[in-house]
């Protein structure tokens, strides 16, 4: 029986939303493995809009749900409509949107908070003991979701790892091709573009993470 996976997107574009390569690799791997997928995003304004050609901020406003719909080809719902009981697992691609829209980690660091609708859903998965996959900068939110002692990775960036540890997480350095698993919490993380120098490098770890998340959903079948 195919598993149902929720995917949270944070906009469209690495500098102000979801990392597009990471999101597409995730959706492709889930489809290749026969999973049913539903994308969600918060219906809120982005922190800001970045010109991805120049890296400069643009004087306009964009909506996270509307922008995320670009990646999901329109098949996306407001995160407030998500019910943990409808899904077997959750995956959150990275990109600065995770640190700017799903949370304010990019601004506040260790003193960050998670957007309330995002926190409600991710905490529901944690409390239900359902598998969760986080990649790139998204694991920076793990301590806010799971509490102290959660084991995860963003690769090997010392400053980010220090902020995560300050929040109560236990950061484990990890190669781009590998994953870190907190077995007690069924949380799987991988560095993706925190380390990847190419789309294929990013895919190596993301595919491994997706595969492991799906394996964990089948453990509940036993």
Model segments located where?
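A short, charged/proline- and glycine-enriched loop
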Residues: 1-3
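Active-site-adjacent pocket-lining segments in enzyme domains
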Residues: 6-20, 24-38, 75-222
């Amino acid at each position: 029986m195919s598993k149902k996976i929720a995917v949270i997107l944070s906009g469209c574009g690495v500098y102000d939303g979801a990392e597009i390569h990471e999101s597409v690799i995730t959706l492709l791997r889930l489809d290749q493995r026969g999973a049913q997928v539903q994308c969600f995003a918060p219906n809120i304004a982005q922190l800001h809009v970045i010109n991805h050609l120049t890296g400069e901020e643009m004087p306009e406003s964009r909506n996270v749900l509307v922008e995320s719909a670009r990646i999901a080809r329109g098949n996306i719902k407001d995160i407030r409509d998500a019910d943990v009981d409808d899904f077997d697992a959750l995956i959150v691609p990275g990109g600065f949107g995770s640190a700017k829209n799903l949370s304010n980690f990019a601004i506040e660091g260790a003193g960050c908070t998670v957007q309330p609708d995002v926190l409600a859903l991710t905490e529901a998965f944690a409390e239900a003991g359902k598998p969760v996959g986080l990649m790139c900068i998204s694991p920076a939110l793990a301590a806010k979701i799971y509490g102290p002692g959660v084991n995860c990775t963003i690769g090997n960036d010392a400053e980010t790892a220090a902020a995560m540890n300050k929040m109560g997480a236990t950061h484990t350095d990890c190669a781009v091709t590998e994953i870190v698993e907190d077995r007690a919490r069924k949380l799987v993380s991988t560095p993706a573009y925190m380390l990847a120098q190419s789309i294929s490098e990013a895919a190596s770890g993301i595919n491994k993470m997706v595969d492991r998340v799906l394996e964990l959903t089948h453990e509940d079948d036993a």
